């Protein structure tokens, strides 16, 4: 059963990949939590469109995309 826009298996794979490729699991967990907190406040401020994806799920997807495709980052 899928209750959000993210497949649970895909989310688990992305999370495992983030942890596996990190040198420090704690800092990776903190980065995910910080990004989720930012997204949560963006949702409250109306900066993001309505989404069924929870902030933690969105943070994991964003961070794994940044890790897998660093050429997409500005700068």
Swiss-Prot record:
The protein's Enzyme Commission number: 2.7.7.6
Superkingdom of the source species: Bacteria
Keywords annotated in UniProt: DNA-directed RNA polymerase, Nucleotidyltransferase, Transcription, Transferase
Top-level enzyme category: transferase
Reactions mediated catalytically: RNA(n) + a ribonucleoside 5'-triphosphate = RNA(n+1) + diphosphate
NCBIfam families: PRK00392.2-5
Function: Promotes RNA polymerase assembly. Latches the N- and C-terminal regions of the beta' subunit thereby facilitating its interaction with the beta and alpha subunits.
Subunit annotation: In cyanobacteria the RNAP catalytic core is composed of 2 alpha, 1 beta, 1 beta', 1 gamma and 1 omega subunit. When a sigma factor is associated with the core the holoenzyme is formed, which can initiate transcription.
Protein name: DNA-directed RNA polymerase subunit omega
Organism: Prochlorococcus marinus (strain MIT 9313)
